[in-house]
């Protein structure tokens, strides 16, 4: 009749088809879920320095430091198909030389099983907030936004922006303080 290899091939093909159908079912059950959540951001301190920029010509550039609070409940974002969330806080502003500037200031990976309720106080920016020039000094509209990338077990990777944003003005003068 059939050889052992042809029976094994049939079993493998059937198993692969069933696994593909189950994966498609997993994707369809969570593909259209709203993953947004309300976010509260508060900036408690802004420090602006004029520092040497070693990446280009020997000019000085603006370096901003931000201390902030984040409050968000991401519990409804997690379901059985979510492996982790990649959270990041970004700053968006415009200058004379660039219409749109976007800088990531802080990030965090939130795994399934960890506490999805964020209540972080006095968090300092994790990454440097450099502007290639002097676009931060006196800028009245630097908008901070918390966003997250949903990493599912199976399916697409949706990018979600939290509903809370905060716009902060930067100071008109540079700080001389040595520590932040």
From Swiss-Prot:
Asked if the keyword Transmembrane belongs to this entry, the reply reads yes
Q: Which residues cross the membrane?
A: 12-32
What spans does the record annotate as topological domain Cytoplasmic, numbered to this chain? 1-11
List GO terms (cellular component aspect): endoplasmic reticulum; signal peptidase complex
Q: Which InterPro entries match?
A: SPC3
One matching Pfam family: SPC22
Membrane topology listed for this record: Single-pass type II membrane protein
Could you name the domain of life of the organism this protein comes from? Eukaryota
Keywords linked to the UniProt accession: Endoplasmic reticulum, Glycoprotein, Membrane, Signal-anchor, Transmembrane, Transmembrane helix
Choose any GO biological process term that the UniProt entry carries and state it. Answer: protein targeting to ER
Subunit comment for this entry?
Answer: Component of the signal peptidase complex paralog A (SPC-A) composed of a catalytic subunit SEC11A and three accessory subunits SPCS1, SPCS2 and SPCS3. Component of the signal peptidase complex paralog C (SPC-C) composed of a catalytic subunit SEC11C and three accessory subunits SPCS1, SPCS2 and SPCS3. Within the complex, interacts with SEC11A or SEC11C and SPCS1. The complex induces a local thinning of the ER membrane which is used to measure the length of the signal peptide (SP) h-region of protein substrates.
Similarity section: Belongs to the SPCS3 family.
> Could you tell me what this protein does?
Essential component of the signal peptidase complex (SPC) which catalyzes the cleavage of N-terminal signal sequences from nascent proteins as they are translocated into the lumen of the endoplasmic reticulum. Essential for the SPC catalytic activity, possibly by stabilizing and positioning the active center of the complex close to the lumenal surface.
Q: What is this protein called?
A: Signal peptidase complex subunit 3
By which gene is this protein encoded?
Spcs3
């Amino acid at each position: 009749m059939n050889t052992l290899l042809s029976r094994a091939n049939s079993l493998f093909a059937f198993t692969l088809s069933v696994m593909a159908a189950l994966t498609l079912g997993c994707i369809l059950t969570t593909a259209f879920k709203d993953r947004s959540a309300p976010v509260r951001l508060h900036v408690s301190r802004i420090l602006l320095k004029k520092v040497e920029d070693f990446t280009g010509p020997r000019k000085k550039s603006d370096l901003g430091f931000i201390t902030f609070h984040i409050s968000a409940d991401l519990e409804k974002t997690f379901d059985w198909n979510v492996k982790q969330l990649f959270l990041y806080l970004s700053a968006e502003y415009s200058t004379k030389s660039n219409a749109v500037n976007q800088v990531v200031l802080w990030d965090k990976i939130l795994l399934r099983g960890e506490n999805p309720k964020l209540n972080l106080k006095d968090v300092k920016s994790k990454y440097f907030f450099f502007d290639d020039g002097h676009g931060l000094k006196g800028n009245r509209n630097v908008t901070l936004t918390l966003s997250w990338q949903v990493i599912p077990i199976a399916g697409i990777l949706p990018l979600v922006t939290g509903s809370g944003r905060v716009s902060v003005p930067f100071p008109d003068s540079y700080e001389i303080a040595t520590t932040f």
